[in-house]
């Protein structure tokens, strides 16, 4: 059996410059907020995701797609550049309490064998981390996910995202990110996708210290995501995180959020988003070169 490794989703430099287009109801809300006619149709999301794959995948080492809106279309249309690996989201988002993703389970409809035949090299699992929910349940889910990936020769990517506790109102996001890393940073996955400390804001030294604390608890390669980070601050966030030990990024919003809902979608992706992704890839290569 052909077993993929993280080297199959990196750039030649060994760094990760990966694009996410697997946002689901959150993306629909972004289109609605941008003034798209309501209700925003599934086809609007699918078209945007497929166009993003076609236009931006040449500049990414991998692209993360979701089964619900675009995996099948991306495969059928050969939307992903040959130089770019495909990652498929293996998480099912369960809405509740007024938010699009209130809990997450492994998507039982996932077919790792088919994904591999379609050219997929990795699966991704979102793990919501709340201090007052059962740690063992999270660890068990990650273990099952890792086994699902590795038994089919696919790379396992976990994405712990912290949330306020179900009960009470005390929430220290920064401490929660560290606590999640302590719990899941040595859980047997191949890659850890993490929220940027401090939302990428503030003095560089503070960001670096926070990122180094995170690095101390993650016993696998790790990358940052861009949700919650101002897109103008994201290139610096990538530099700082990589200085602390990260190996790149897996991000969507910092690359394409600014063109959601604009006319001439393909043109916007090419003229506005592609240069951003290219620049981020250059930063990853530059930071990896410093490690040699």
UniProtKB/Swiss-Prot annotation:
GO BP: any one term: 6-sulfoquinovose(1-) catabolic process
EC number: 4.1.2.57
Active site residues according to the UniProt entry: 193 (schiff-base intermediate with substrate)
Keyword annotations: Carbohydrate metabolism, Lyase, Schiff base
Catalysed reactions listed for this entry: 6-deoxy-6-sulfo-D-fructose 1-phosphate = (2S)-3-sulfolactaldehyde + dihydroxyacetone phosphate
Enzyme class name: lyase
Gene Ontology terms, MF aspect: 6-deoxy-6-sulfofructose-1-phosphate aldolase activity
Complexes and interactors: Homotetramer.
Role of this protein: Cleaves 6-deoxy-6-sulfo-D-fructose 1-phosphate (SFP) to form dihydroxyacetone phosphate (DHAP) and 3-sulfolactaldehyde (SLA).
Family stated for the protein in its record: Belongs to the aldolase LacD family.
Protein name from the UniProt record: Sulfofructosephosphate aldolase
Species of the source: Escherichia coli O157:H7
Organism placement in taxonomy: Bacteria, Pseudomonadati, Pseudomonadota, Gammaproteobacteria, Enterobacterales
Gene name in the database record: yihT
